Amino acid sequence: MPKMKTRQSAAKRYEVTGSGKLRRRRAGKNHLLQHKSAARKRSLSTKVEVSETDLYKVTRQCPYL
């Protein structure tokens, strides 16, 4: 059976922590930032853990991550 291919677009969006969990960026911090508060922009800058419901989809797209 051939190796599974990694979806490169998905591989660029996630990073693995030291404990093996996946982290992702938050949505909403690319443009239209002038009306958002500084606190909101700061909180959007942090990375969050991928939820348990999405973990299956991400691991299918990036099997070797």
Curated annotation (Swiss-Prot):
Q: Which Gene3D superfamilies match?
A: 4.10.410.60
InterPro entries membership: Ribosomal_bL35, Ribosomal_bL35-like, Ribosomal_bL35_CS, Ribosomal_bL35_sf
- Write down the PROSITE patterns for this protein, in alphabetical order: RIBOSOMAL_L35
The biological process GO terms on file are:
translation
Does the keyword section mention Kinase? no
Residue ranges with Basic residues bias: 21-44
One Gene Ontology cellular component term attached to this UniProt record is: cytosolic large ribosomal subunit
Domain of life from the UniProt record: Bacteria
Is Lyase one of the keywords?
no
Region feature (Disordered)? 1-46
Keywords, in A-Z order: Ribonucleoprotein, Ribosomal protein
Q: Which cysteines are joined by disulfide bonds?
A: none
Q: Tell me its family.
A: Belongs to the bacterial ribosomal protein bL35 family.
The molecule here is called: Large ribosomal subunit protein bL35
Q: Which organism is it from?
A: Gloeobacter violaceus (strain ATCC 29082 / PCC 7421)
